[in-house]
Amino acid sequence: MDGADGRLGVLMGSGHEAALSAEPTLRKLGPKPMRIPPVILLALAPGVLIPNLLAQNPTSPPNVVPTGVLSVSDPDLEVTLWAQSPQLKNPTNLDFDGEGRVWVAEGVNYRGHHQRQPEGDRIVVLEDTDGDGRADSQSVFVQEKGLLAPMGLAVIDNRVIVSMAPDIIVYTDVNRDRKFDPAVDRREVLLTGFNGRRHDHSIHSVTQGPNGQWYWNAGNCGSMFTDKSGRTFRIGSAYDGGRDLGWEPMKIAGMKSDDGHVWIGGFAARMNPDGSQVRIIGHNFRNSYEQTVTSFGDVFQNDNDDPPACRTTFLLESGNAGFCSADGKRSWGADRRPGQSVPVAEWRQEDPGTMPPGDVYGGGSPTGIAFVEDSALGPKYRGLLLSCEPGRNVVFGYLPKPEGAGFALKRFDFLTSNREGEFSGTDFQGGSNPQRQLKTLFRPSDVGVGADGAIYVADWFDPRVGGHADWDDTTSGAIYRIAPKGHRSRPAKVDLSTPKGAAEALKNPVLHVRAAAYNALQAQGPSAIKPVERLLKDPNPHVRARAAWVLSLDPRQGLPKVAGLLKDSDPQIRVVAFRALHQAAEKNVVADNSGSSRKQAPGSRAFFLETAQRLASDPSPAVRREVAVSLRDEPYEIAGPILLTLADGFDGTDRTYLEAWGTGATGKEAQVYGALVAKSQGRGAVQWTPALAALAWRLHPESSIRDFKARGLAESLSDAERKRALTALGFNASPAAADAVLEVAAKSSGTVKAEAMWWLLNRKD
């Protein structure tokens, strides 16, 4: 009995988990119910097995992972249970408002259980009204039969954006009572055409970025939609996600969209809040569950995979993750080359045109992601990236550090129930969970920062994750709060009615409170300039960045101040300034002084191009990266000289820089290649520097065939360099390229010959 009493203290954690008292039964979590005597239940500890968890009992409380099972990385922080079923069920996504409320999208009707709740799924609102650190109020904002496990939720002022395939739905709470009433409030389908009605590889959550645009993504089920500007996007892949909408995803793979580019699902995009001017910002994912956008405008995401190569990644603008072939017709497995590991093959890291995968950590099923800039955790955690990984019972933490043109992502377990790494109930462990341990039931589905600055984590709670399965018939869920020990919930008052109040709200820890502040300042016009300008002196660089984005809205007073930030000592602030000026130029907010001797005004296209040429020699690779990707749709006559300057700054090894540069050369590869080789002072292909060889490899136009054949045949080069030359030839569709590979195969031996033969046998078409 002494041992049982000791374990009970661990089980009960902070005392909030009365739901796991000495109840003789737990709820049914699997197909084989059984009874557990109270003495056994009392003895349960995190590492003790829970045999085939148990029979249903209408009077028993819902299940929850006790806080004593959870551990947080910092001893100065504590985990408390903020909410649990029946206050919420099966949480798929969270968002937060400025008053401290947590909004939850539920997924009771998930996949095979789509009829479990005939009234449809809900968006619920939870609140801690007495400040004791525990939700005590619950209401339902909306419940509809058409809501079947919605995968995304955003709350921006009185607009509630729900991602429910095939639609992005915007509810406007006109009277702000947090209860949708169709007689008073508005419901609009903003965009439609996302395949996968009951599939979690479809449309995911919307996030407002610091530039006022909405960011969102969809998995690889396929999408064909028309934005409010009238442009249609056709995004398929080699994955058959069903035919819910009357077209086949695999048949639209490789088709051009109306923006002139070929995009492969999954993908991420940004657009104006009215659904116009969609721009794809990354593609060829498997199923990225969510994205997070920093105040600098950097985008981070995670992506689940065919085990074992899940990843957390900095998303390069227009980046190709490489899950399918460039035309979307073939899976990564069909193109896997001899000697390639799964991570290298799956994210095509030896192919030109694919971005670095970031942190590839193995099997899993990543879900929600958040970037922490302002929180109760203090300056130590400013810039903390959090990524939920339910397959591993953990919320990963990263503190991204600039590294070349990208970021170093060093992973640690921020919050976990499974320090031992004994996983079960996941695809990478075979799917089944015959030995269900309490520590493996923690399935974090989303994470974010609340109005009190604490971190909130939603728990799906289930023995199974992945494979479109859920085994918890109780549909239990919970929300945990991570904060400094003794933290009291005191959300700051938000006043968006005045420029001063709205400017102050730009410092709020809640992402979409800051978004509402941006929108309010935009509506207030020039009167907002002075209070926002003061924020440029804030010691927090994220606050300075937010101010820059708001100032870029004003052509006369604001944009010149943003232009002044191009000389800032912080490279990230220079990145923000350049991005803001580029996006202003895209919107044509300022006319060019064509034919005039007057200096070009910030915000004009001419000023943007002058700035791009100047910053092509910036000491920061990150700044030069942004210059490179901004040139994608520019003609060679404009982009060529800038790209050649950027080429001089390539160190020969920085893959993010190389891909950014290649993105800038899109559609003009042959011209850039010719100029690049001409600039090499007559060096033959075999004598190319490593930097020139990599740049040429990234371009690989038809005019490069002779040069790469020479490199493939050159025994003076390493086998790795010769195989890289074969890759450049293999990615060229010209018959001359096939002849070149054949010649290399005939005249080589060993691994080079084997590589050449692979290309010949696998590119017969």
Task: Give the role of each language-model region.
Residues 21-27:
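N-terminal polybasic/positive-inside topogenic patches
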Residues 39-52:
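Bacterial N-terminal signal peptides
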Residues 475, 482-593, 599, 604-765:
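Long, ordered, helix-rich scaffold segments
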